[in-house]
Each structure stands twice: as C-alpha cells, then as structure tokens.
A protein has these predicted regions:
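Acidic, glycine-rich flexible loop/linker segments
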Residues: 2, 41, 48, 59-72, ...
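Cysteine-dependent phosphatase catalytic core of the protein tyrosine phosphatase
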Residues: 1-74
C-alpha cells in the first residue's frame, strides 16, 4: 500500500520510462493522494476526538486555544501556534484568522465564512461542531471544558477536534507532482479542444 507521495512518484516515473501512458499515470493517482501531498495530516492518535464537526478545509493543526483576534495576535507574537475557536466568524475576525494555524466554529458548514476564508488561506478548519460552546475564557466541547491558552488540535480533513497536541506530518510535495499536473492540463486541453 503506497503513500500518496510514493504513488505519485511511481506513476510519473513509470510513465517517463514508457512503462505506462501518461493517461494511466493520471488515473493511478487518487484525489486522496493529492490531499496527502498538499496538506499537513494528523498521524493516527490513540485518543478519541472530543467532537467531530464538518471537515471544512483540509489539513491539521495543533496550537494554543484562542477565543479572540487579540488572543491570536498575542499568541503568534509570543512565537506560538494559535487555533482560533468561535461560535461563528465574520469579517471582524479576519485579522485573527489570517494569523491562526487553524480555525474551528460551532456554527456553519462548507459555505460558511470560516470555511471559505480558511480554504482561501490554505488553513485547516472544522465547522458546525454541534457540541461546541464558546465562552469568554474557555470552550465546552463534548462535556469537557478547555481554557483559553491550552493546547488543542483540529483535523480539517476529518472534522475531528482533540484536546492537547497531536502529531502532525507536514505535507511533502514531490517534484513529480508538477509533471503530473502538466499532463493533466494537456489531457484536459485535448478533451475540450482548447
């Protein structure tokens, strides 16, 4: 069972060696392989998630729980990662969102402000966490209270929220991905006659 990275490298190498066609190389790569090489991923964890919301923007992040724009900015200024939690976000939250490593909200879905803004920035996000209640100084989630400044983790690919730190593997994008995407562009142009 190949990782996404290995599958992309193997498929491109086989096509470059004329063992398979470029079309077969494209077909061999699953969309999940692309997610794996473009976004950070959470390694398997022994702990159960506190809650599962909507996987609104892929990737995973661990950092200090922040409940306001000011808290995010202070955390980042101190050289630490910030995860912004809110009942929902709006334009007034964008300075904090921009500096966060990840975003989580109680309300909203794939078309919510938090989801769209996070995807635009390439940040992981979990939205629509039904069990989440945000107060001025803490969150209540899945029957657990977590104070602002505590470690928390989100997985925007699965929608999971974990207390504490989880191990995250940074995206490892192979150089062969550029070749594969060029072949995809060529195949697309051939199909639509542009």
């Amino acid at each position: 069972n190949l990782t996404g990275h290995d599958n992309i490298v193997t498929s491109v190498t086989k096509a470059e060696n004329n063992d398979i066609s470029t079309e077969e190389a494209i077909s061999n790569v699953d969309p999940q392989d692309l997610m794996e090489v473009l976004f950070s991923t959470a390694d398997e964890t022994e702990t159960e998630p506190l809650a599962i919301g909507i996987a609104a923007s892929p990737g995973a992040a661990t950092g200090k729980l922040c409940l306001s724009v000011d808290a995010v900015l202070e955390t980042v200024d101190a050289g630490e990662e910030a995860i912004m939690f809110a009942m929902e976000t709006g334009p007034e939250d964008e300075p904090g969102m921009r500096w966060s490593s990840g975003i989580a909200t109680a309300h909203g879905g794939l078309a919510s402000h938090a989801a769209i803004y996070s995807r635009g920035l390439g940040l992981p996000a979990v939205c629509g966490i039904a069990e989440l209640n945000v107060t001025e100084s803490s969150i209540d989630i899945g029957g657990v209270t977590i104070n602002e400044g505590s470690e928390i983790s989100i997985n925007g690919t699965t929608g999971e929220v974990h207390a504490g730190k989880i191990h995250i593997s940074e995206a490892e994008t192979p150089s062969e991905l550029t070749t594969l995407l060029d072949w995809c562009d060529q195949a697309r142009h051939n199909l639509i006659g542009v």
